[in-house]
Amino acid sequence: MAVTLPESVLAQYERFSLYNSPYPAHDGGCAIDLYPGTLADGRTTAAPSPVAGTVRETRTVRAPPKPYAPEHDHLILIDPAASGPLAGLTVRVLHVEPSVAAGDRVERGESLGRLVRAGFFAPWVDNHLHVGVRDPDQNPYRASGSLPLELGVSVRPLEWDGTGRVVSTGDTYAVLDSPAHPDPGAAFVGVRADDGGVLDGGLPHYDGGGLLERPAPVDTAGAPAERVVSLNGDRLGVADGRTIAWDDATVTANGEPITGLSLFCARDADFGAKLICPERSFERGELVRVRVRSSDER
């Protein structure tokens, strides 16, 4: 059973991604990362609740050891309100140090606490809420096992020719001015694949990605057909349904390899292609051309 996240949930956040994560909980789009804001370096601490409901439990959980993050994360379980779209399910939220406790009633958009940077994060990842939805009889503590998520909003595919000028940088990333959001705040957008759909995921530094907003073609047997996904003529991988298995490929910037390309959905004015490049630095204003090179071309 898939669960649809309505516009009332997603509209509270500036950005989201179903696939841009290395963790199995996101496999098949079974979890979503919700980004409340885009403060400098992505370090906002606001943590608005995705749903109205009653807090069932909060607990501290272990996180992967990283030198830049504490060894613990936090889990918040919420029983959604009976009048809400997720009634009867369990909502689990990670990466929030809770200011709420079991039995507290929260409204949609009300603060759950303070966003934290956990060991689940790569250093280039902005602060966010990790959200999954489960049936009430499922184990809510296991890292994986949440229900597949569908989007109750449309995401506009933006064509991008792979070029842009650097507008912001961090120790591990650079953001380009293209593709630019044509109407910030009005709708979510993302990078368009050559044959349609919106690309989502870490290319290729995470195992796979997603192709959103594209009807699945049907083969002669009536089953969803696999299809090749490309960007600017460069092959990225093969999609089975909406899930992409990346090829053994390398992202290049001005002809030199970088770690990858971060692909997500956004509605804010700061949207642009995000290069993951801890091994390289770029200057603001620098013109960059991004391509994807297959293993056969190395």
Where are these regions (language model features)?
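Short, well-structured beta-strand-loop connectors
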Residues: A46-E57, V100-L115, G285
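Short glycine/threonine/proline-enriched tight-turn/helix- or strand-capping micro-motif at secondary-structure
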Residues: Q12-S49, K66, P148-V153, A186
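Generic structural motif
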Residues: S49-E57, G109, A216, T220, ...
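Extended, charged low-complexity segments
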Residues: V238-R298
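Conserved, short, structured surface segments that act as functional micro-motifs
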Residues: P67-E71, R108-S168, D296
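Zn2+-dependent peptidoglycan hydrolase active-site motif and core
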Residues: V55-E97
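Anionic-ligand-binding alpha/beta catalytic cores of soluble enzymes and soluble regulatory domains
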Residues: G132, S144-L149, V155-G233
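Short histidine-centered loop motifs in beta-beta connectors
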Residues: G88-G109, L275-S281
